[in-house]
Each structure stands twice: as C-alpha cells, then as structure tokens.
Curated annotation (Swiss-Prot):
UniProt keyword Cytoplasm, yes or no: no
Domain of life: Archaea
Subunit field text: Homodimer.
Protein name: Probable inosine/xanthosine triphosphatase
Native source species: Archaeoglobus fulgidus (strain ATCC 49558 / DSM 4304 / JCM 9628 / NBRC 100126 / VC-16)
Cofactor(s) this protein cannot do without: Mg(2+); Mn(2+)
Similarity annotation: Belongs to the YjjX NTPase family.
InterPro entries: ITPase-like_fam, Non_canon_purine_NTPase, NTPase/PRRC1, YjjX_NTPase
Function according to Swiss-Prot or TrEMBL: Phosphatase that hydrolyzes non-canonical purine nucleotides such as XTP and ITP to their respective diphosphate derivatives. Probably excludes non-canonical purines from DNA/RNA precursor pool, thus preventing their incorporation into DNA/RNA and avoiding chromosomal lesions.
UniProt cross-references to NCBIfam families, sorted A to Z: inosine/xanthosine triphosphatase (TIGR00258), PRK03941.1 (NF003039)
Alphabetized Gene3D superfamilies for the sequence: 3.90.950.10
UniProt keyword Hydrolase, yes or no: yes
Length: 169
C-alpha cells in the first residue's frame, strides 16, 4: 500500500477481505509527482504512482489511494472531492472511484489559495490529524461516512476487473 495512513490501510484491508482470505496490508511511504493537494487528473496519476511504487514481486497486489478535487458543474463551489484507488498486480493497473462530496465554500476558497484540504478542515472541525483519523467526510456527514468507508469503496471499485478476470481479458 502506497501510504501509511491508517484510514487508507484499513479501507483497503476491508475491500480485499471481501474477496480474498489471509489479507495482509503493508503500508509504505512513497513519493508521487502529484502535488500535496491534487486536482482532477493529478489525483488519478497520484493513485497510480502510489500503487506502482509500492509494488514488490513479493506482493499479489499493491494499492494507491489519492483524494483530490475534481471540477464539476451543478455544485456550490465548482468542485467535488473524490477518493481514487489504483490496484496493481505487476502487469495490470485498474482504477476505482469512491463517492464524491462537496466541501463548504470556505474550504474550497482556501484550497484554491494554496492550502491543503486537511489543513483547512482541521481548523474548521477543531480535530487535529482529521485525515488520519475519520476524515473530513466523517465530520461533514455527521458520522455517517468515514474516510475508511471511502477507501474501501474506491478499492472495491478498482478490484472489479481482478475479481472478474474472465470478463476483462
């Protein structure tokens, strides 16, 4: 796993445990060319690079997860946040998205000035290291959805071609 973030690791574990036995997730720090606060295609590229850089022939799969803002019409701020997962088996890389949601206008305004979502949301929520705990989505959804949930869903979506190999030849 191309991250040591506990919410991402746990989400990936839950996704893989839906389909595989004896799942072990090893988190490793990797660097990517994506900026600290990615937008649009930078988010997808960051997830792919995390998965590929975390890969070792000792692993069956590696995973990269990256959250970022995507431009979108019909939103208050013009942006939605999506968590993107990439799963890599040494040959094939697949992508999955989690559910998208919108940050408050004041958060997006600060991000567009160069701050990271996590930094702004810590101030808004008063919760230190929010992104490594339950995530901003947990705070904004009043506890209904956690960052672990978003990670699980995005990794599950990325696993679809692997769990249906005969359909994705």
């Amino acid at each position: 796993m191309g991250s040591k973030n506990p919410t991402k690791i746990e989400g990936a574990r839950r996704a893989f445990e839906q389909y595989f036995d004896d799942v072990e997730i090893v988190g490793v720090e990797v660097s990517t060319s994506a900026p600290p606060q990615p937008f649009d295609a930078e988010t997808v590229r960051g997830a792919i690079e995390r998965a590929k850089k975390a890969y070792s022939p000792d692993f069956d799969f590696s995973v990269g997860i990256e959250a970022g803002l995507f431009r979108s019409e019909c939103t208050i701020t013009g942006y939605l946040d999506f968590q993107v997962a990439a799963v890599y088996d040494g040959e094939r890389c697949t992508i999955g998205f989690g559910p998208g949601f919108e940050y408050p206008k004041l958060v997006v305004e600060e991000v567009l000035k160069g701050k990271e979502v996590g930094e702004v949301m810590e101030k808004v929520s008063g919760i230190k290291n929010l992104g490594k705990k339950v995530g901003a989505v947990h705070y904004l959804s009043k506890g209904a959805i956690s960052r672990t949930d978003l990670s699980r869903i995005s990794v599950t979506m990325a696993l679809i071609p692997f769990i249906n190999r005969e359909m994705y030849l």
